[in-house]
Amino acid sequence: MKRLLIFVIPLLCLLSCEDAKYSLDNRFDPENIDLRPPALFFHPPEILTTIDTSIAIELYGLELEPAAAAHLDIRYDWGSVTVDSVIPGPFFSGQNNPMEITVDEQGVLDIYLYYLPDVQNNQNEGGTWSLATVYFSTISAGESELLYGTNTILRDANNDSVRIKDFGSGYINVK
């Protein structure tokens, strides 16, 4: 009888258990954004907000090759949002913090990011990282499309272009 219980109890526990089913299809995950890597995109791709609000949008790279510098040419509707500030992301961070220069002119935001070399590296390792975070303030109702302009380029330590296959877009909808 004891042998039977030793056999039956674990069998009942085993048969009564059911594996959990998870839905791992977050549309904001880089794997689910429908871009061919290496790519640049905005995260989050869509923001619904109100007037007089501060919002943050990250400029992301998907499976980028190693780079030492970037010129990010960001286009936006300057009638509904204004740029407050730009903070470099971890993509160009090494032992030294990256250098960043920002020029904002009526709907065109030029961001220049530079990896500051150290004794071990003269460029980053590449990968999927945030290149920068842009903070916007909303000033009027409307929709602002975010685009990477034609001047967007990444360079490696030899000043060669880093290939980018695809560019994502973003939207800020101000109610």
Model-derived regions, located:
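Sec-dependent bacterial lipoprotein signal peptides
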Residues: 1-17
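Acidic, low-complexity intrinsically disordered segments
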Residues: 17-175
